[in-house]
Structures are given as structure tokens and as C-alpha cells.
Amino acid sequence: MGQKVHPTGIRLGIVKEHTSVWYADGATYADYLLKDLKTREYLQDKLKSASVSRIDIHRPAQTARITIHTARPGIVIGKKGEDVEKLRQDLTKQMGVPVHINIEEIRKPELDAMLVAQSVAQQLERRVMFRRAMKRAVQNAMRIGAKGIKIQVSGRLGGAEIARTEWYREGRVPLHTLRADIDYNTYEAHTTYGVIGVKVWIFKGEVIGGRQEELKPQAPAPRKKAAK
């Protein structure tokens, strides 16, 4: 039976970059790794309502630089920067080194796999029909300019007794093409019937010579004239 490799892991160093960048010897490697994991868990918990997609951690010369990619930067920053300063102080205590926080806004959340998965999961928790939630997310992504998108949900869909998997796809999603920029992420919806897993693949174009194809919104199909 064929198994699928992680779409991001296989592309690291080709079209994807690591979310943690630092050098460590054998004695400190495990310590750095655990601190990174706890830092991400802490930020995801603190910023649940801020639509956080990705957290990058860099450790240059006894400091830490954390970049938070979010669709709602105002919630992260807070009034007059109070919230982000409190985050910085807490993370400095937790990591044991001076921390600098950068915030990057996600301009097109419809093309971010994590944010799309979060949106579908939240709709499932509000008892929206799973097919409607998937179709709406797919149509929004294709309208903004995605080359292809696939969404898969697994679990007791609609409260069914037996769990099953359903998926919906539009456009191309070439998982075997290493130069293809595919954004992949997962999220969980906690419903009254149990946990429903959501997976999202978004194909944004091929990276050729270090340059990505420009994403353009798809033009609407020309209308056919009715026969008289």
C-alpha cells in the first residue's frame, strides 16, 4: 500500500525553508529543540484568536529572533504595543536569552494552508455542513489565484456512526514535483461527536531558478451567448 511523504519535509532545502534555524552541539541540541517546541505551544495558546499561521525561530549569537506570521497583526501587537511587549518579556524568561519579536502580516489568508484549515475546522465546530465548508474554502482560494487546492476531512462527519474520509479538489496539486510550491497543513475540529481532522494542500505555482511564478487571480469564464 502506497504511503505519502510529508509535502513540506520532502521540499526542505529545495523550495521550503526550516522554521527553526540555529546551530548546536550534542549537549545543547535537545535543550534548544524542547524550548522551541514549548515556545510554539505557548504562542499558539496565547494567540488563538490572532489567526497565526507560522512561527519562525532564529538563534543568532545568544539571542532569539521570533517571527510571527499572522493575518491579524493588531491582535498580536495590542493597544500601543502592550501585548507584544508582554509576550517578549514572557518568552525572554522562558527561553533564557533576550528575545526580539517580529510580526509579519499575511495579506492573502485564503492562500495559507494553516488558516484555511483553521477556518474549515471552526465552521465544523459551528455545525456547518462539511461539504459546504470545503467548497467555500476551495472557491475562495481559486478566486484569489491558487493554481490548485485539495481539502480533506476525516472523522464522524455529520455525526455518522462510522468515521469516514471525504475530500474536495480543484486545479492541480502535483505532490511529486519537488519544485512545486505546495503549502500543506493540518488542524483539528473538536465537535460533540469527536475530533474531525482537516488537511489542506495549496499549490501556489512552480519555483523556477529561485523565482516563483506570479500568482494571478483567475479571470471569470466568458459567458456563452444563448442561442436564439
Curated annotation (Swiss-Prot):
Residues of the KH type-2 domain: 39-107
Biological-process GO terms, alphabetical: translation
Parts forming coiled coils: none
This protein's GO CC annotations: cytosolic small ribosomal subunit
This protein's UniProt keywords: Ribonucleoprotein, Ribosomal protein, RNA-binding, rRNA-binding
Protein family per UniProt: Belongs to the universal ribosomal protein uS3 family.
Function: Binds the lower part of the 30S subunit head. Binds mRNA in the 70S ribosome, positioning it for translation.
Name this protein carries in UniProt: Small ribosomal subunit protein uS3
